[in-house]
Amino acid sequence: MGVRNCERRAGLVEAGGTTPGSAQRTEEGPPMNTTAQSRSMQAAVVTGPGRITIKTLDLPEPGPNQVRIALEGCGVCASNLTPWAGPDWMTFPTEPGGLGHEGWGVVDAVGSAVTGIAPGQRVAALSYHAYGTHDLAEADAVVPLPASLAGQPVPGEPLGCAMNIFARSDIAAGQTVAIIGIGFLGALLTQLAVKAGAQVIAISRRPFALELARRMGAHTTIAMDDHWRIIEAVKALTGGQMCDRVIEAMGKQWPLDLAGELTRERGRLVIAGYHQDGPRQVNMQLWNWRGLDVINAHERDPKLYVSGIRAAIAAMEDGRLDPTPLYTHVYRLEELDDALNATRDRPDGFLKALVTYP
């Protein structure tokens, strides 16, 4: 399935108004202008729970070791959903462009000390205000994109995240690998594990996701509907040995419980899900008895993020990774609220939202 451009809802709100069940959306300034001659930019600001405004700002100037990027788009990350909901600890309004960290585009200015990167280069970047037409990034957090990827969306951060998780999983040919949760990340990991020669068991709630996993090369798919039925199914598939590697990619308690049950003795349980909603309980008796290696595959070193982005670009070039069919929903900047709500609600057929800046 290719990228699907989502039509704007009928009855889209005017400035300051709402439609039933929608987020409040306001717009400030003229329509978006991303021409090379413009000295202004537009950026989304989250003004409160479920509310955005679009602001027109002066273009920022890069510092000595920074580059400025005219962004083509930004992926929408599920980690945005907690601040979008407005928990007590969240402070509003956000900085312009804030929460966006999956941007790609074309360098249009560089700092005085920057070498090796020039205006006109297309790049993926690790930056933190990418819900806007332009953003600044440190020069060492920018990865040039090859000509072979021209025209393709490249939200570098989640692609790099998938590569880093795959590396920490230590997957090899002939292994049996279960992946619990076939969203964007789980689908990428399915591709990578299959290309590495593993036998992949994909487990997900949604029939759409299971069909997608089969297209990604999964050898077996299992509906995530009953804890003990899944365990027995995997036991039958593996001759009672269970799985060499299990990747939990949902960030919830039940998938974490299930992951432990599916991992064989001295196997590796990889936590790839983003757990945001409180403490977790684990079956330490089971983990101890089986001698599991438990890996928290989330990286926090920006240098590792950037190396993951480089690895993802290489994998896209050589065919090990093809994220293009996974970008299911595309929105304009002024529709960022719709993109966040779709990421939260996950309508049928949803996998990954992009916000693009034509």
Where are these regions (language model features)?
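NAD(P)H dinucleotide-binding glycine-rich loop of Rossmann-like/cofactor-binding domains
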Residues: 109, 123-180
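C-terminal hydrophobic helical "lid"/dimerization subdomain
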Residues: 33-39, 257-260, 265, 308-358
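C-terminal substrate-binding/catalytic core of Rossmann-like NAD(P)-dependent dehydrogenases/reductases
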Residues: 231-235, 278-328, 338
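Glycine-rich beta-strand-centered segment in the early N-terminal region that forms part
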Residues: 60-75, 87-129, 148
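Glycine-rich cofactor phosphate-binding loops and adjacent beta1-alpha1 units
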Residues: 216-293
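Mid-domain Rossmann-like dinucleotide-binding core that forms the NAD(H)/NADP(H) cofactor-binding site
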Residues: 19, 24, 152-226
